[in-house]
Amino acid sequence: QVKGIADAVVDAPQVALDGGVGEVIVAPNTSDVEELEERSRRRAAALAGSSGEGATRDGTKIKLLANIGTAEDAEKAATQDLEGSGLFRSEFLFLDRESAPTVEEQAETYTKVLQAFGTRRVVVRTLDAGADKPLSFADLGEEENPALGRRGLRLSQAREDLLTDQLTALATAAANVPDAELWVMAPMVATVDEAKWFAERARAAGLAKVGVMVETPAAAIRAWQVLEEVDFASIGTNDLSQYTMAADRMQGELADLLSPWQPAVLSMIRETCRGGEATGKPIGVCGEAGGDPLVALVLVGLGVKSLSMAPGKVNAVRAALRLHDFDTCRQMANFAVDARTARDAREAVLALADPVLKDLL
């Protein structure tokens, strides 16, 4: 969000937008337009040939996945050159309705999603409601601070019937599409007990791959213990930034604090990856940070094994990975974590990057 942007452009005869860097030029001159067109040509050249599996220049495999929210999203994403979905936001089945979806209704949607991706991985996040996504039928009362209240898994613990139905529906979908690679994860897990509670119920429902989202400093710091209870973890960088920096991610004025380049946030990601290494469990990222080609290199250097993002960002991230070997990514990660500020972190990484990468940003 940019303060005053609406007033600044209302009388402008022309506005130029560079979506690659998030830059708006009000009343651009001929030179501005020519520069944008040249930048667009260089970006197209940098993306040329970006296809196939995600991997660094020296062959370290990194799965590149899509974030989706509906069966229609799945059908569109599945036609693209990516390796599955690292985040299916199941809450869209529950929002804006007076009663919970039935097991049959959910199973039908999950089946369509799995069928769309065939044998490719699909990671479903169980109901992530509460806070900015309230459920009218949950009957949990008003909360003074919903972001720190009963959201994510906490809501599922308060309304276990909702989770039971969802896990049953997911198991049904998995049975309907036996070749599918279904992974299921719980949001907003903060403790080992919560991870164990969810894993026991998911496995009892017949689900084979069970994980958690790391969105709180508590889960990141104790990731090695949390991961002893589950099969994988996925880092939600949006909420992890919010809770690490104590900054509401819905307030645009705090965007600088919520930057994925904040060294404190990167330290949390490093701790989570160390937990993954200690337990032999894979760590992924499904927040917006994974779709930034430059940040993606740092995440890989920290030990992240998969990146899930908006489908349209996959090609740029894949191209960025292929420009760098893993040792360079690791060096970038060390520089970023050790930086004093978010700006210093980004500048240090950019200085190590292949010059062609700038055309992808």
Task: Tell what function each PLM region has.
Residues 42-361:
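Conserved alpha/beta-domain cores
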Residues 13, 18, 239:
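Conserved acidic functional residues
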Residues 16-50:
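Acidic/Gly/His-enriched mid-domain segments of enzyme catalytic cores or analogous surface patches
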Residues 1-14:
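Conformationally flexible catalytic loops at phosphate/diphosphate-handling active centers
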